[in-house]
Amino acid sequence: MPKLGMREIRRAQLIDATLRSIDEAGLPGTTLASVAQRANISTGIVSHYFGDKDGLLEATMRHVLRDLWAATTRRRAAASDAPRARLRAVVAANFDDTQISAPVMKTWLAFWSQSMHEPTLRRLQRVNTRRLHSNLCAEFAKTLPRARAREAASGLAALIDGLWLRGALAGEPLDTKAALKLANDYIDQLLAPRV
């Protein structure tokens, strides 16, 4: 009988191997066998924990999304209650170290592509999109009329995704300082008093 906690340890090991496999071989080159080889275990164990490749990608993305939510929660807790500070915290979480490593960025790209074809992954993407929009909208609504807050949240979410996507596709490390400056300048413009 396995030790208490062995399941969680094994799943984490396999998720790490999946991230590395997607980084090195892309999603098409990532198989249960390639993940098993990277983790030095049998393919049967990978199949036991995740069922198939889609289950493996889903579990890996749930892990990445938990990291994103933890970064968001941590950064919002450290920010002041001012909407500008809390918006900046949400932006910074999306460019957190847990979200911009090559393995994670390539996994995000693979996930987005697969989410157009797999209902379970599509649902995860919708949850993530709604969570981001809700967080942004709640902060903008503290200083802007409701309709304007929704527009601002949609615009900032698109900017975050666009900056992140361009960074992921650049083929070099993401310039988080430049991305944060652009997003924070956009927040400042949206919250500036109108004359």
Curated annotation (Swiss-Prot):
Residues 31-50 bind DNA. Pathway: Amine and polyamine biosynthesis; betaine biosynthesis via choline pathway [regulation]. Residues 8-68 form the HTH tetR-type domain. GO terms for biological process: glycine betaine biosynthetic process from choline; negative regulation of DNA-templated transcription. The keyword Iron does not apply. GO terms for molecular function: DNA-binding transcription factor activity; transcription cis-regulatory region binding. Keywords: DNA-binding, Repressor, Transcription, Transcription regulation. Pfam families: TetR_C_6, TetR_N. InterPro entries: BetI_C (IPR039538), DNA-bd_HTH_TetR-type_CS (IPR023772), Homeodomain-like_sf (IPR009057), HTH-type_TetR-like_transc_reg (IPR050109), HTH_TetR (IPR001647), Tet_transcr_reg_TetR-rel_C_sf (IPR036271), Tscrpt_rep_BetI (IPR017757). Repressor involved in the biosynthesis of the osmoprotectant glycine betaine. It represses transcription of the choline transporter BetT and the genes of BetAB involved in the synthesis of glycine betaine. HAMAP family: HTH_type_BetI. PANTHER family: HTH-TYPE TRANSCRIPTIONAL REGULATOR BETI, HTH-TYPE TRANSCRIPTIONAL REGULATOR RUTR. This is HTH-type transcriptional regulator BetI. The gene is betI.
